């Protein structure tokens, strides 16, 4: 059995790590490299960095901190934010990132997924999906440019359809960001994640809602995801990564300790 992965997420804005609730009202929580080093030292399996306003503001990730992170940590990490071209992706990988993730640019130009996987291989192409449960229509819908409240907009895609589309185009992994659960620490959306898991032939990473160790256990045991991403519980010291891994191991969840 493949070990489940614990993935701290670092949202980056103007050179600092920030965290919001349901993608709004972001507050500064720390500096990029020290936080990355802390999580690597605590036993994280990999890290994800999102430059949350890069796509909305039509710019790309600052390569300087990417190289500094690569120099300091010895675990895989993924970067996302404003990557629209092969050249931009190549630069981030050259500066030390192991994977690149695209979200809003893929919605604007789905063929970008195919071009990236043809150039670099699908193993390092991650698709982030910001999924919002719409109570009126009782459906899951994909939103775009979510890093900036003023720029956030609806798309024509239902989450299930977009999950199938990005796989057809060659993504190697999917991060499902459940917007309704983000930052509220009430647990992962097991129902939605289970539904998406049934459509996924690639690794699925759950994002949004972690508040307790039991939430991690449930998302692995019930939704069968491959990895669980979380931010605020790690940033605020609510959950220690090594303690979490011991808890998961004691509950028959395979993890690297």
Swiss-Prot record:
Record keywords, A-Z: Amino-acid biosynthesis, Cytoplasm, Histidine biosynthesis, Lyase
Enzyme superclass (EC): lyase
GO biological processes: L-histidine biosynthetic process
The EC number(s) this enzyme carries: 4.3.2.10
UniProt-listed Pfam families: His_biosynth (PF00977)
Localization: Cytoplasm
Pathway annotation from the record: Amino-acid biosynthesis; L-histidine biosynthesis; L-histidine from 5-phospho-alpha-D-ribose 1-diphosphate: step 5/9
Reported function: IGPS catalyzes the conversion of PRFAR and glutamine to IGP, AICAR and glutamate. The HisF subunit catalyzes the cyclization activity that produces IGP and AICAR from PRFAR using the ammonia provided by the HisH subunit.
Name of this protein: Imidazole glycerol phosphate synthase subunit HisF
Organism: Shewanella piezotolerans (strain WP3 / JCM 13877)
Gene that this polypeptide is encoded by: hisF
